[in-house]
Amino acid sequence: MAKNILHMMTPLAHMSPFDVNMALDAGYDATASYTNVSLGEITDLIQDAMFSRSPRDAVRTGVFIGGKDALLALDMLDAAGKALFKPFEISLFADPAGSFTTAAAMIAVVEKTLKEKKDRALRGAPVSVFGATGVVGTASAVIAALEGASVTLVARDASDRTTRHAAEINRRFGVNLAVADGSTPQSRAAILTGAEVVLAAAKAGVRVLDAGELAGAGKLLIAADVNAVPPSGIEGVDAHANGTPLGERGALGIGALAIGNVKYRTESGLFKQMTESKTPLRLDFRQAFELARTLA
Protein backbone atom coordinates (compact mmCIF):
# COMPACT_ATOMS: atom_id res chain seq x y z
CA MET A 1 0.00 0.00 0.00
CA ALA A 2 1.31 3.44 -0.92
CA LYS A 3 2.65 5.52 1.95
CA ASN A 4 1.40 9.01 2.74
CA ILE A 5 4.37 11.26 2.00
CA LEU A 6 4.42 15.00 2.70
CA HIS A 7 6.91 17.32 0.98
CA MET A 8 7.27 20.41 3.17
CA MET A 9 8.55 23.56 1.45
CA THR A 10 9.56 26.92 2.92
CA PRO A 11 11.36 30.04 1.68
CA LEU A 12 13.06 30.22 5.09
CA ALA A 13 16.29 28.60 6.27
CA HIS A 14 14.44 26.01 8.35
CA MET A 15 11.15 24.16 8.16
CA SER A 16 9.00 24.66 11.24
CA PRO A 17 9.43 21.74 13.69
CA PHE A 18 5.88 22.48 14.85
CA ASP A 19 4.45 21.67 11.42
CA VAL A 20 6.62 18.57 10.99
CA ASN A 21 5.34 17.20 14.30
CA MET A 22 1.75 18.07 13.41
CA ALA A 23 1.95 16.32 10.05
CA LEU A 24 3.42 13.10 11.43
CA ASP A 25 1.02 12.99 14.37
CA ALA A 26 -1.90 13.53 11.99
CA GLY A 27 -1.04 10.40 10.03
CA TYR A 28 1.70 11.07 7.50
CA ASP A 29 4.15 8.19 7.20
CA ALA A 30 7.08 10.39 6.20
CA THR A 31 7.96 14.03 5.62
CA ALA A 32 10.75 15.65 3.62
CA SER A 33 11.75 19.28 4.13
CA TYR A 34 12.91 21.71 1.44
CA THR A 35 14.31 25.03 2.66
CA ASN A 36 15.25 28.34 1.03
CA VAL A 37 12.76 27.54 -1.72
CA SER A 38 12.03 30.40 -4.11
CA LEU A 39 8.75 30.98 -5.91
CA GLY A 40 10.44 30.16 -9.19
CA GLU A 41 11.46 26.71 -7.97
CA ILE A 42 7.99 25.53 -7.01
CA THR A 43 6.92 24.16 -10.40
CA ASP A 44 9.91 21.85 -10.80
CA LEU A 45 9.66 20.57 -7.23
CA ILE A 46 5.95 19.87 -7.55
CA GLN A 47 6.31 18.01 -10.81
CA ASP A 48 9.27 16.05 -9.47
CA ALA A 49 7.08 14.89 -6.59
CA MET A 50 4.03 14.03 -8.67
CA PHE A 51 5.72 12.08 -11.46
CA SER A 52 7.40 9.64 -9.07
CA ARG A 53 4.14 7.81 -8.32
CA SER A 54 1.44 6.17 -10.38
CA PRO A 55 -1.76 8.12 -11.01
CA ARG A 56 -3.53 5.75 -8.63
CA ASP A 57 -1.18 6.68 -5.79
CA ALA A 58 -0.74 10.38 -6.63
CA VAL A 59 -3.24 11.48 -3.98
CA ARG A 60 -1.04 9.88 -1.31
CA THR A 61 1.52 12.61 -2.03
CA GLY A 62 1.04 15.95 -0.32
CA VAL A 63 2.82 19.30 -0.36
CA PHE A 64 2.88 21.73 2.55
CA ILE A 65 3.94 25.37 2.09
CA GLY A 66 5.26 27.24 5.11
CA GLY A 67 7.29 30.39 5.68
CA LYS A 68 6.34 33.65 7.37
CA ASP A 69 4.80 35.59 4.50
CA ALA A 70 1.09 35.02 3.92
CA LEU A 71 0.96 36.49 0.43
CA LEU A 72 4.10 34.68 -0.74
CA ALA A 73 2.69 31.40 0.57
CA LEU A 74 -0.47 31.98 -1.46
CA ASP A 75 1.63 32.76 -4.53
CA MET A 76 3.54 29.50 -3.98
CA LEU A 77 0.26 27.62 -3.55
CA ASP A 78 -1.02 29.11 -6.80
CA ALA A 79 2.20 28.15 -8.62
CA ALA A 80 1.95 24.64 -7.22
CA GLY A 81 -1.63 24.32 -8.39
CA LYS A 82 -0.73 25.47 -11.89
CA ALA A 83 2.03 22.84 -12.04
CA LEU A 84 -0.49 20.01 -11.59
CA PHE A 85 -2.44 18.21 -14.26
CA LYS A 86 -4.46 15.02 -14.47
CA PRO A 87 -3.95 12.21 -13.70
CA PHE A 88 -1.01 13.11 -11.44
CA GLU A 89 -2.72 15.62 -9.14
CA ILE A 90 -1.55 15.79 -5.53
CA SER A 91 -2.82 17.59 -2.44
CA LEU A 92 -1.58 21.07 -1.45
CA PHE A 93 -1.78 22.92 1.87
CA ALA A 94 -0.44 26.38 2.73
CA ASP A 95 -0.17 27.48 6.36
CA PRO A 96 2.79 29.87 6.75
CA ALA A 97 3.94 30.04 10.38
CA GLY A 98 0.65 28.38 11.28
CA SER A 99 -1.00 31.69 10.49
CA PHE A 100 -3.88 30.47 8.34
CA THR A 101 -5.06 27.94 10.93
CA THR A 102 -4.43 30.37 13.80
CA ALA A 103 -6.38 33.15 12.08
CA ALA A 104 -9.15 30.74 11.17
CA ALA A 105 -9.38 29.62 14.79
CA MET A 106 -9.39 33.17 16.12
CA ILE A 107 -12.17 34.36 13.82
CA ALA A 108 -14.18 31.18 14.41
CA VAL A 109 -14.01 31.59 18.20
CA VAL A 110 -14.80 35.31 17.94
CA GLU A 111 -17.75 34.61 15.65
CA LYS A 112 -19.14 31.95 18.00
CA THR A 113 -18.70 34.14 21.09
CA LEU A 114 -20.35 37.12 19.40
CA LYS A 115 -23.34 35.02 18.43
CA GLU A 116 -23.79 33.07 21.66
CA LYS A 117 -22.94 35.73 24.24
CA LYS A 118 -23.64 39.03 22.49
CA ASP A 119 -26.37 38.08 19.99
CA ARG A 120 -24.27 39.81 17.33
CA ALA A 121 -23.19 38.56 13.92
CA LEU A 122 -19.66 39.02 12.65
CA ARG A 123 -21.09 40.45 9.44
CA GLY A 124 -21.17 44.21 9.73
CA ALA A 125 -19.19 44.33 12.96
CA PRO A 126 -16.39 46.94 13.13
CA VAL A 127 -13.16 44.95 13.62
CA SER A 128 -9.77 46.53 14.37
CA VAL A 129 -6.66 44.42 13.78
CA PHE A 130 -3.43 45.19 15.65
CA GLY A 131 -0.30 43.53 14.27
CA ALA A 132 -2.05 43.77 10.94
CA THR A 133 0.91 43.34 8.59
CA GLY A 134 2.07 40.08 10.17
CA VAL A 135 0.99 36.68 8.90
CA VAL A 136 -1.75 36.09 11.47
CA GLY A 137 -3.00 39.66 11.27
CA THR A 138 -3.17 39.49 7.49
CA ALA A 139 -5.07 36.22 7.39
CA SER A 140 -7.42 37.29 10.20
CA ALA A 141 -8.25 40.53 8.41
CA VAL A 142 -8.98 38.74 5.15
CA ILE A 143 -11.17 36.08 6.75
CA ALA A 144 -13.15 38.65 8.74
CA ALA A 145 -13.58 40.90 5.70
CA LEU A 146 -14.72 38.03 3.50
CA GLU A 147 -17.31 37.22 6.16
CA GLY A 148 -18.67 40.75 5.91
CA ALA A 149 -17.01 42.47 8.85
CA SER A 150 -15.89 46.09 8.53
CA VAL A 151 -12.15 45.64 9.04
CA THR A 152 -9.53 48.26 9.89
CA LEU A 153 -5.80 47.54 9.89
CA VAL A 154 -4.10 49.49 12.65
CA ALA A 155 -0.72 50.98 11.70
CA ARG A 156 1.79 51.14 14.55
CA ASP A 157 4.12 53.65 12.89
CA ALA A 158 4.03 56.59 10.52
CA SER A 159 5.25 54.70 7.44
CA ASP A 160 2.95 53.79 4.57
CA ARG A 161 3.70 50.07 4.91
CA THR A 162 0.26 49.21 6.31
CA THR A 163 -1.48 51.28 3.63
CA ARG A 164 0.41 49.48 0.87
CA HIS A 165 -0.31 46.14 2.53
CA ALA A 166 -4.04 46.88 2.72
CA ALA A 167 -4.11 47.95 -0.92
CA GLU A 168 -2.54 44.66 -2.00
CA ILE A 169 -4.98 42.62 0.10
CA ASN A 170 -7.93 44.57 -1.27
CA ARG A 171 -6.71 43.98 -4.82
CA ARG A 172 -6.21 40.25 -4.33
CA PHE A 173 -9.36 39.39 -2.44
CA GLY A 174 -11.88 42.02 -3.49
CA VAL A 175 -12.35 43.31 0.05
CA ASN A 176 -12.25 46.85 1.40
CA LEU A 177 -9.85 47.00 4.33
CA ALA A 178 -9.39 50.42 5.90
CA VAL A 179 -6.20 51.68 7.57
CA ALA A 180 -5.98 53.78 10.72
CA ASP A 181 -3.04 55.37 12.48
CA GLY A 182 -2.40 53.65 15.82
CA SER A 183 1.01 55.10 16.56
CA THR A 184 -0.05 57.17 19.59
CA PRO A 185 -2.30 56.59 22.61
CA GLN A 186 -4.63 59.28 21.29
CA SER A 187 -4.98 57.67 17.86
CA ARG A 188 -5.54 54.24 19.40
CA ALA A 189 -8.23 55.70 21.64
CA ALA A 190 -9.98 57.07 18.57
CA ILE A 191 -9.88 53.65 16.91
CA LEU A 192 -11.26 51.92 19.99
CA THR A 193 -14.17 54.34 20.22
CA GLY A 194 -15.89 52.62 17.32
CA ALA A 195 -14.54 49.06 17.52
CA GLU A 196 -16.79 46.17 18.49
CA VAL A 197 -14.06 43.57 17.99
CA VAL A 198 -10.34 44.00 18.59
CA LEU A 199 -7.84 41.40 17.36
CA ALA A 200 -4.27 41.43 18.69
CA ALA A 201 -1.94 39.58 16.32
CA ALA A 202 1.39 41.27 17.00
CA LYS A 203 4.67 39.48 17.71
CA ALA A 204 4.88 37.26 20.78
CA GLY A 205 5.50 39.22 23.96
CA VAL A 206 4.46 42.57 22.48
CA ARG A 207 1.64 44.45 24.21
CA VAL A 208 -0.45 46.49 21.80
CA LEU A 209 -3.21 47.71 24.12
CA ASP A 210 -3.23 48.48 27.83
CA ALA A 211 -6.13 48.51 30.27
CA GLY A 212 -6.40 52.28 30.20
CA GLU A 213 -6.88 52.30 26.44
CA LEU A 214 -9.51 49.54 26.64
CA ALA A 215 -11.41 51.46 29.31
CA GLY A 216 -12.42 54.02 26.70
CA ALA A 217 -13.74 51.42 24.25
CA GLY A 218 -17.42 51.95 24.89
CA LYS A 219 -18.70 49.73 22.06
CA LEU A 220 -16.21 46.90 22.53
CA LEU A 221 -17.76 43.42 22.61
CA ILE A 222 -14.78 41.10 22.06
CA ALA A 223 -11.02 41.45 22.52
CA ALA A 224 -9.06 38.46 21.19
CA ASP A 225 -5.32 37.96 21.65
CA VAL A 226 -3.20 35.24 20.01
CA ASN A 227 -0.08 36.07 22.03
CA ALA A 228 0.74 33.31 24.56
CA VAL A 229 4.09 34.83 25.61
CA PRO A 230 4.00 37.30 28.55
CA PRO A 231 3.14 40.08 28.53
CA SER A 232 -0.19 39.53 26.82
CA GLY A 233 -0.95 41.48 23.68
CA ILE A 234 -4.00 42.99 25.37
CA GLU A 235 -3.73 43.82 29.05
CA GLY A 236 -6.30 41.91 31.07
CA VAL A 237 -6.86 39.13 28.52
CA ASP A 238 -5.59 35.95 30.15
CA ALA A 239 -4.27 33.23 27.87
CA HIS A 240 -7.02 30.90 29.14
CA ALA A 241 -9.83 33.43 28.63
CA ASN A 242 -12.70 32.10 26.54
CA GLY A 243 -15.49 34.63 26.55
CA THR A 244 -14.33 35.87 29.95
CA PRO A 245 -15.53 39.29 31.21
CA LEU A 246 -13.02 42.05 30.51
CA GLY A 247 -13.27 45.38 32.30
CA GLU A 248 -16.48 47.00 33.49
CA ARG A 249 -18.24 47.71 30.18
CA GLY A 250 -19.32 44.16 29.35
CA ALA A 251 -16.61 43.27 26.85
CA LEU A 252 -15.36 39.68 26.70
CA GLY A 253 -11.80 38.43 26.34
CA ILE A 254 -10.54 35.49 24.28
CA GLY A 255 -7.00 34.35 25.00
CA ALA A 256 -4.26 32.55 23.14
CA LEU A 257 -4.88 29.11 24.59
CA ALA A 258 -8.59 29.15 23.78
CA ILE A 259 -7.67 30.09 20.22
CA GLY A 260 -4.76 27.66 20.17
CA ASN A 261 -6.95 24.70 21.07
CA VAL A 262 -9.04 25.27 17.96
CA LYS A 263 -5.96 26.08 15.86
CA TYR A 264 -4.28 22.80 16.81
CA ARG A 265 -7.32 20.73 15.91
CA THR A 266 -7.80 22.68 12.68
CA GLU A 267 -4.26 22.11 11.42
CA SER A 268 -4.33 18.47 12.49
CA GLY A 269 -7.71 18.02 10.86
CA LEU A 270 -6.56 19.44 7.54
CA PHE A 271 -3.52 17.15 7.51
CA LYS A 272 -5.83 14.21 8.26
CA GLN A 273 -8.09 15.21 5.39
CA MET A 274 -5.08 15.06 3.08
CA THR A 275 -4.03 11.60 4.28
CA GLU A 276 -7.55 10.19 3.99
CA SER A 277 -8.96 11.89 0.90
CA LYS A 278 -9.46 9.90 -2.27
CA THR A 279 -9.24 13.08 -4.34
CA PRO A 280 -6.57 15.82 -4.31
CA LEU A 281 -7.20 18.76 -1.99
CA ARG A 282 -6.10 22.39 -2.11
CA LEU A 283 -6.17 24.00 1.32
CA ASP A 284 -5.56 27.54 2.54
CA PHE A 285 -7.14 29.92 5.07
CA ARG A 286 -10.59 29.48 3.52
CA GLN A 287 -10.76 25.73 4.11
CA ALA A 288 -9.11 26.26 7.50
CA PHE A 289 -11.92 28.61 8.50
CA GLU A 290 -14.59 26.19 7.30
CA LEU A 291 -13.15 23.50 9.56
CA ALA A 292 -12.43 25.83 12.50
CA ARG A 293 -16.07 26.89 12.55
CA THR A 294 -17.08 23.29 13.25
CA LEU A 295 -14.50 22.98 16.04
CA ALA A 296 -14.96 26.28 17.90
Language-model segments: which ranges?
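Glycine-rich phosphate/diphosphate-binding loop of Rossmann-like nucleotide-binding domains
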Residues: 113-197
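Glycine/charged-rich beta-loop-alpha catalytic/anionic-binding loops adjacent to active sites
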Residues: 85-93, 123, 247-250
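N-terminal ligand-binding/catalytic initiation module
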Residues: 1-87, 286-296
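A glycine-rich, Thr/Ser-enriched phosphate-binding loop motif common to dinucleotide/cofactor-binding enzymes
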Residues: 94-112
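Conserved active-site and cofactor/substrate-binding residues in soluble primary-metabolism enzymes
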Residues: 37-41, 71-75, 101, 105, ...
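Short glycine/serine/threonine-rich phosphate/pyrophosphate-binding segments
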Residues: 103, 134-140, 162, 206-209, ...
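Adenosine-phosphate binding glycine-rich loop
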Residues: 2, 229-296
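Rossmann-like adenosine-cofactor binding region
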Residues: 175-253
